[in-house]
């Protein structure tokens, strides 16, 4: 790796239209898993001005069976969608949780897909689709995440918390952040540029002589304070450039400003561009879908490898075929930072964790309603707490060391 370089990652807030769609989709996943831990869900969401549309396939005992909805199920789905939007904070003329039109186009899962995936006599549960999945970890932050993405997430998470608490009442739900860091010897040494664009209450802008300079100064001062709280002080220098709402006025936002779709922020969801991505989104999918569960187990394995001191950086790839239980390939890359041969680690991992779809779900406890909270501010680098974010645990460290005799 080069000795000195710049690297950038971005994040988007829970009020970004694509993230609104992700959170709605995962709220539906949680709704069905709470009723049937073996539910099959593939829920896509479209959001736009005063409209939310669901589409996809499901199978859920007691909710949708034999092509029929259970009494009250459709009302519960709509209530879940509206509650999710309300919790995000949308009560605007162009997008209001209690006034948008709602369309539910969910229907039954294809029996031809089900026959390849379901367990049967003498047959293990197969992968729900073919594909490649990547996991990554780095020791550059306590969360074992790329610092550029870690800080981008935390800036927006703090702003959302302050908005909901009334500390920053001039903020509205839609926002984006971007952090550029200079690295030396693979360590972040300086923030060269930070971008924050946030939707705001009327009047809180000043651009090309238009707007209210005092209100914009208040907003800018607040955002700079959040940045100073999130980033380590030694990274912020006299040369750091700040772009706070650089286009000026940002009053129309969220689904009223741009249409949102599930699965369009997969780099924000994962590693901010620091790692390869297999291309499959997570939100709206139950954990039998390896796009989701295999991405979680690869993060878990990579994080435990780095936490065990076996490497400073680790990338893992798994691949699957639809209807086939075992992965087709396992690949480990320690980026020249490892203390153990990568081939040895590749051989050991399947001995420690069964990497079939069912094995992954069992090891991590994924058949639970834990997904809405993953759908904003990143699926990785979060705090494992009870059932939440189990792929962030580091409980495999000792077993890895023992298996590799280190």
UniProtKB/Swiss-Prot annotation:
Would you tell me the Gene Ontology cellular component terms? cytoplasm
Query: Which residues does the annotated region (Flexible loop) include?
Result: 109-119
- Which residues does the annotation say bind K(+)? 44
Q: Which residues bind Mg(2+)?
A: 18
Q: What's noted on cofactor binding? A: Binds 2 divalent ions per subunit. Binds 1 potassium ion per subunit.
Record-linked InterPro entries: ADOMET_SYNTHASE_CS (IPR022631), S-AdoMet_synt_C (IPR022630), S-AdoMet_synt_central (IPR022629), S-AdoMet_synt_N (IPR022628), S-AdoMet_synthetase (IPR002133), S-AdoMet_synthetase_sfam (IPR022636)
Required co-factor?
Mg(2+); K(+)
What are the entry keywords?
ATP-binding, Cytoplasm, Magnesium, Metal-binding, Nucleotide-binding, One-carbon metabolism, Potassium, Transferase
Instruction: Tell me where it mainly resides.
Output: cytoplasm
Record-listed E.C. numbers = 2.5.1.6
What family does this belong to? Belongs to the AdoMet synthase family.
The name under which this protein is listed is S-adenosylmethionine synthase
């Amino acid at each position: 790796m080069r000795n000195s370089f710049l690297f950038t990652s971005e994040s988007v807030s829970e009020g970004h239209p694509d993230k609104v769609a992700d959170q709605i989709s995962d709220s539906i996943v949680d709704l069905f898993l709470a009723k049937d831990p073996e539910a099959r869900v593939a829920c896509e969401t479209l959001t736009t001005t005063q409209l939310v549309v669901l589409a996809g396939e499901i199978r859920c005992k007691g909710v949708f069976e034999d092509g029929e909805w259970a009494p009250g199920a459709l009302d519960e789905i709509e209530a879940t969608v509206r509650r999710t939007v309300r919790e995000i904070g949308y009560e605007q003329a162009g997008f209001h949780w209690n006034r948008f039109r709602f369309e539910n186009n969910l229907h039954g899962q294809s029996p031809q897909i089900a026959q390849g995936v379901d367990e049967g006599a003498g047959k293990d549960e197969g992968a729900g689709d073919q594909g490649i999945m990547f996991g990554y970890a780095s020791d550059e932050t306590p969360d074992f995440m790329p610092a550029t993405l870690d800080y981008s997430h935390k800036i927006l998470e703090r702003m959302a918390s302050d908005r909901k608490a009334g500390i920053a009442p001039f903020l509205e739900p839609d926002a984006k952040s971007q952090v550029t860091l200079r690295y030396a010897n693979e360590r972040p040494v300086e923030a060269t540029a930070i971008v924050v664009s946030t939707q705001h209450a009327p009047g809180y802008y000043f651009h090309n002589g238009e707007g209210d300079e005092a209100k914009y100064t208040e907003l800018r001062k607040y955002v700079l304070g959040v940045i100073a709280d999130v980033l380590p002080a030694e990274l912020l220098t006299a040369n750091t450039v700040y772009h706070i709402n650089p286009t000026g006025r940002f009053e129309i936002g969220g689904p009223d400003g741009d249409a949102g779709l599930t699965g369009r922020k997969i780099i924000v969801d994962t590693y901010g561009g620091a790692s390869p991505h297999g291309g499959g989104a997570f939100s709206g999918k139950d954990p039998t879908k390896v796009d989701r569960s295999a991405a979680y187990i690869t993060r878990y394995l990579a994080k435990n490898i780095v936490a065990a001191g076996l490497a400073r950086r680790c990338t893992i790839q798994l691949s699957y075929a639809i209807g086939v239980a075992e992965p087709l390939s396992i690949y480990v890359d320690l980026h020249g930072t490892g203390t153990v041969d990568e081939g040895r680690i590749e051989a050991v991992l399947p001995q420690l964790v069964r990497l079939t779809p069912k094995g992954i779900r069992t090891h991590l406890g994924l058949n639970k309603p834990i997904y809405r909270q993953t759908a904003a501010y990143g699926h990785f680098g979060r705090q494992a707490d009870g059932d939440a974010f189990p792929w962030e645990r580091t409980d495999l460290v000792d077993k890895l060391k023992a298996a590799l005799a280190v």
